[in-house]
UniProtKB/Swiss-Prot annotation:
Keyword list, A-Z: Cytoplasm, FAD, Flavoprotein, NAD, tRNA processing
Signal sequence range: none
One term under GO cellular component: cytosol
UniProt-listed Pfam families: GIDA, GIDA_C_1st, SAM_GIDA_C
Gene Ontology molecular function, alphabetical: flavin adenine dinucleotide binding
Cofactor(s) for this UniProt protein: FAD
PROSITE patterns in the record: GIDA_1 (PS01280), GIDA_2 (PS01281)
Gene name, Swiss-Prot/TrEMBL: mnmG
Function as written in the Swiss-Prot or TrEMBL entry: NAD-binding protein involved in the addition of a carboxymethylaminomethyl (cmnm) group at the wobble position (U34) of certain tRNAs, forming tRNA-cmnm(5)s(2)U34.
Chief location bin: cytoplasm
Family listed: Belongs to the MnmG family.
A GO biological-process term: tRNA methylation
Name of the protein described by the UniProt record: tRNA uridine 5-carboxymethylaminomethyl modification enzyme MnmG
Binding site for NAD(+): 269-283
Length: 621
């Protein structure tokens, strides 16, 4: 008997199984196809706005995704470099096949982890507690806990034009049947969501004299804090083009055969990743939409047509593609399609990702209504950590909104109405100046170490880095930069300092002043500073912390206020009916979501500040 069974080996399942095994639990990972683990069923990329931050957080906690993309990436870019550091987001194109092969090797090398090719079609529950899983082969396997990471496989239905086929991820992969019904019988409620993917085309059929080349960054930072430099790594270009008025006219001729407009698709699709037909229908004033041509690997001719997600008939798809500049002779290898699938509203899970209806049963990934590889991987990681800790009778690890984007993600899931596929944005995080990609290790290594996923040496390195930041900051506050040196460093039109010089910490708040420039101008100063730390990553942290010092102090004060509400626990059996003074809507929402803390309750739409005040009085605070 295993401690933990993980059903599904996508991005959530892989991280869940690795986290469980690395934290000391025996784990079995079950997949319908073990050659397709961590498959990138949609875009061949990791990271991007907010998603890059999540990927680095996964790494800081001891997960695998960042290492995988560093090893298999084919193009690396830092997005939003023209904006402040809170908005900088790493993104990488992946070699889709190599990524799966890398993750398969990692899974097979893990000591406490076994793999099984089969399909989970049901669960057994005894006395409100998880007991075992039922397999398609007829076997029943017992375990202490289970994590369901089913992706889009639950009663999956694929749509291409007016045709539809049962499919879990592609037409070639069958859906999972029986598991939804088993969960409903155990007390869960389910609904349908929809997502889609663009066609893939043969990159040899693209006219590269017309499309715009997009190269990767020359010296990109790695995703993983443990990877070392990836500068000099071979990269491959992406390409940019756009739809035309003719494209839109062609696609409109297929609207009468679109499952989206005919009502065949009942599931709600992702608001922020609409299909091309939806974009044309909703934004009639737009003459064109950007199309990004993204290679799927070094050793394949398949190209992903980002921005052209569609479920229109195949003849309309190919005609539309061939109306796009640079794609007049394009050959379509695989058509785009939409897929409907079952999910379970995340109001049915706790912050630990354990379900409320069945003890020791956890949900992670698209089963909770999210979209995106990174969001799924983050949930899998936390579910694996917390399932393992639950079996050891240890408290769950809860990341707060001020700790990580992962904390924002999980908090949003358990407090908001998730009626469409949820994806993370930087705007979702009110503390995004604190939650930067560059400081994920400083924020989260302690949690990974507590969970048993970050070893002692790595944790000591992080503590040493943090100490160097503190000592370097103190040094810069104590050292005065001579006025003449500052004059030479500042642009002529800038405000000149008063006589007497300026502390180095204050000078670094001026535009254009960096530690490297100060080091170049003042060799003795540089020598003294480098005795404290010669680590450029330490220098980067010091510069950011000083430049945004006032803003960071305000954010930290705000997090302290929120922390007081987070410390007030609401028992799961709390009797809201007995609390006089609650609004009727507030009581209804509190009964539906059953928040675990007063802070969580305060973020539920429909729960007013006066409702929170009433609860504080009831709790005796």
């Amino acid at each position: 008997m295993y401690d933990i069974i993980v059903a599904g080996a996508g991005h959530a399942g892989c991280e869940a199984a690795l986290a469980a095994a690395r934290s000391g639990s025996s784990c079995l990972l079950i997949s319908s196809d073990l050659t397709a683990v961590a498959r990138m069923s949609c875009n061949p990329a990791i990271g991007g706005v907010a998603k890059g931050q999540i990927t680095r957080e996964i790494d800081a906690l001891g997960g695998e995704m960042a290492k995988a993309i560093d090893a298999t990436g084919i193009q690396f870019r830092m997005l939003n470099l023209s904006k402040g550091p809170a908005m900088h987001s790493p993104r990488a194109q992946a070699d889709r096949t190599a990524y799966t092969e890398y993750m398969k090797r990692v899974l097979e090398a893990e000591t406490n982890l076994d793999l099984l090719q089969d399909t989970v079609t049901g669960i057994e529950v005894r006395g409100g507690q998880f007991f075992g899983v039922e397999l398609q082969s007829g076997r029943i396997l017992r375990a202490g806990a289970a994590i369901l990471t089913c992706g889009t496989f639950l009663n999956g239905l694929i749509h291409i034009g007016m045709n539809h086929f049962p499919g879990g991820r592609t037409i070639a992969e069958p859906p999972v049947t029986g598991l939804t019904e088993s969960l409903v019988a155990a007390g869960f409620t389910t609904a349908r969501l929809k997502t889609g993917t663009p066609p893939r085309v043969d990159r040899r059929s693209i006219d590269y004299s017309i499309v715009i080349e997009q190269k990767g960054d020359e010296n990109p930072p790695p995703f993983s804090f443990s990877s070392g430099s990836i500068a000099g790594k071979e990269q491959i270009s992406c390409f940019l083009t756009k739809t035309t008025h003719k494209t839109h006219e062609i696609l409109r001729t297929g609207f009468d055969r679109s499952p989206l407009f005919s009502g065949k698709v009942q599931g709600v699709g992702p608001r922020y990743c609409p299909s091309i037909e939806d974009k044309i229908h909703r934004f009639t004033e737009r003459d064109s939409h950007h199309i990004f041509l993204e290679p799927e690997g070094f050793h394949t001719n398949e190209m992903y047509v980002n921005g052209f997600s569609t479920s229109l008939p195949e003849d309309i798809q190919i005609a539309g593609l061939q109306s796009i500049p640079g794609m007049e002779e394009v050959k379509m290898i695989r058509p785009g399609y939409a897929i409907e699938y079952d999910y379970f509203h995340p109001s049915q899970i706790r912050r630990s990702l354990e379900t409320k209806a069945v003890e020791n049963l956890y949900f992670a990934g698209q089963i909770n209504g999210t979209s995106g590889y990174e969001e799924a991987a983050a949930q899998g990681l936390m579910a694996g950590i917390n399932a393992s800790r639950k079996l050891k009778e240890l408290p769950p690890i809860h990341l707060q909104r001020s700790d990580a984007y992962i904390g924002v993600l999980i908090d949003d899931l358990v407090t908001k109405e998730t009626n469409e596929p949820y994806r993370m944005f930087t705007s979702s995080a009110e503390h995004r100046l604190i939650l930067r990609h560059d400081n994920a290790d400083l924020r989260l290594r302690k949690f990974g170490h507590t969970a048993g996923l970050v070893d002692d040496d790595t944790y000591r390195e992080t503590l040493s880095k943090d100490d160097e930041i503190v000592r370097m900051t103190a040094f810069l506050r104590s050292k005065t930069i001579p006025t003449t040196a500052l004059y030479n460093l500042l642009p002529a039109e800038s405000n000149r300092p008063m006589t007497g010089g300026q502390k180095a910490a204050s000078a670094l708040k001026r535009p254009g002043i960096t530690l490297n420039r100060l080091f170049a101008a003042l060799p003795d100063f540089a020598k003294e500073a480098r005795l404290i730390s010669s680590n450029p990553l330490v220098h980067e942290q010091v510069e950011i912390n000083l430049a945004y010092e006032g803003y960071l102090k305000r954010e930290l004060l705000q997090t302290e206020k929120v922390a007081r509400l987070e410390s007030l626990i609401l028992p799961e059996t709390f009797n809201y009916h007995s609390v006089t003074g609650l609004s009727s809507e507030g009581r209804e929402k509190l009964l539906h979501f059953r928040p675990e803390t007063l802070g969580q309750a305060s973020r539920i739409m429909g729960v007013s500040p006066s409702d929170i005040s009433v609860l504080m009085v009831r709790l005796g605070r």
